[in-house]
Amino acid sequence: MTFVESMQRRAVLAQKRLVLPEACEQRTLEAARLIVFRNIAAKVFLVGCERDIKNTADRCGIDLTDMVVIDPSVSKHRDQFAERYFQKRKHKGISLAQAAEDMRDPLRFAAMMLDQGHADAMVAGAENTTARVLRAGLTIIGTLPSVKTASSCFVMDTNNPRLGGTRGLFIFSDCAVIPTPTAEQLADIACSAAESCRTFIGEEPTVALLSYSTKGSGGDSDENILRVREAVRILHERRVDFTFDGELQLDAALVPKITEKKAPHSPITGKVNTLVFPDLSSGNIGYKLVQRLSDADAYGPFLQGFAKPLSDLSRGCSVEDIVAACAVTLVQSNGR
């Protein structure tokens, strides 16, 4: 069973509610039809102009049976959501009138549905930019109490258990959101990646914070090393509930014999299934190298660290990409 198949199966069992704010888009509607057909969600909310959604569905021959269309401009929740949004943003100088206008936007309205418990998961990005999706998430939903940083991860399936990880599966983080994380942000990313490991891989995380240096081999003057080292100190200070170590080079993290030589007292020997990269460049290059130069499958990026589950799509996504992202995001909502 592939990772996507396992996520869809788990979503069927979880039976959570999904909100889709790009419901005037043909791919979104086709994905919603498949989600209903496969029973992946308990309920599917389509947010947008009702007339435009139905026109798109009619033009494309998509049956909207068993889906709920919500038009923000006439929704019974519009005033309540506008007031809530105003309370969240008034420190930025927003007026109640502007809040009401902003709540006409399907993306913001869907995010508020998620925030207020009317849905369990949100997926967007087929039309909206990543920046807009992240902004809606951060301004309306916010991050988990335990972290201050929203980030992302990939699930990497190397299709080769001999390479390590958990049955050949790894979490790579952060590969899509924060260009140059601070030490505090790196610690947050490690915590979120550990939770993603539990959610997606189903095993206890063993986290390696990566660097070009292993335990001081690169000296003590480079800020890039010091940030990772400080992140490790912060994790110790937080008394996190997962095994971790750093700073470590990749081979010292993954190859037990090299770990024993370069970091003989490391608690992670032979057990790493979660890799935290020092910056976005290394993370993005790293996952693409593994994907393109081996027989690995890369799934993601999946957002992590938000108070409620939401996912960002590539604007070039296929219908099945949307279905997969929805299944993953619904699985993230299970247990929250």
From Swiss-Prot:
Which UniProt keyword terms apply here? Acyltransferase, Cytoplasm, Transferase
Query: What GO molecular function annotations does the UniProt record carry, in alphabetical order?
Result: phosphate acetyltransferase activity
User: Which superkingdom, per the lineage?
Assistant: Bacteria
Residues folding into a coiled coil are: none
Q: Where is the signal peptide?
A: none
Per the UniProt entry, the Enzyme Commission number(s) are: 2.3.1.8
Which NCBIfam families does the record associate with it?
PRK09653.1, pta
What name does the UniProt record give this protein?
Answer: Phosphate acetyltransferase
